[in-house]
Amino acid sequence: MSMGSFGFALAVMVLAVLVASAAGAPNTNFVSSACNTKKIPSGNPFFNNLGALLVNLEKNTAFSGYDYKASRAGSGGAPTAYGRGVCKQSISQSDCTACLTNLGGRIWGICKNAIGARVQLTDCFIRYEQYSI
């Protein structure tokens, strides 16, 4: 391999490493939480509303300016669930979605069925409540 070919190959490898590291997974390290002390009673239909709301936040925040509010109307006499998803502007849309999906799966364990919660990971944030936010 000539020196010119070697230099070109080296430049391509360095560029590939830089692109791969820039497109890495989101940082889902736990930062903080605030959980309402009131709990959702077992079997309450609010769980279904809240579950649908979290999926909505996970799927739409990245495509709504990285700061998205939504609500899920109550069914079966349950209160409406209100929520907000936020991602750092510096991450990709796919990393935003991945971060919120990760957080959506962890929020139950962090806040133990609380009727309201705010949980921050390094790259994303979810808040949900039983009142408009």
Curated annotation (Swiss-Prot):
Residues 1-24 form the signal peptide. It comes from the Eukaryota. Keywords: Antibiotic, Antimicrobial, Disulfide bond, Fungicide, Lectin, Mannose-binding, Plant defense, Signal. InterPro entries: Cell2Cell_Antifungal, GNK2, GNK2_sf. Disulfide bonds join C35-C111, C87-C96, C99-C124. GO terms for cellular component: plasmodesma. The keyword Cell membrane does not apply. It holds the Pfam family Stress-antifung. GO terms for molecular function: D-mannose binding. Residues 28-133 form the Gnk2-homologous domain. Alpha-D-mannopyranose binds at N36, R118, E129. GO terms for biological process: defense response to bacterium; defense response to fungus; killing of cells of another organism. Exerts antifungal activity through its carbohydrate-binding specificity. This is Antifungal protein ginkbilobin-like protein 1. It comes from Picea sitchensis (Sitka spruce). The lineage of its organism: Eukaryota, Viridiplantae, Streptophyta, Embryophyta, Tracheophyta.
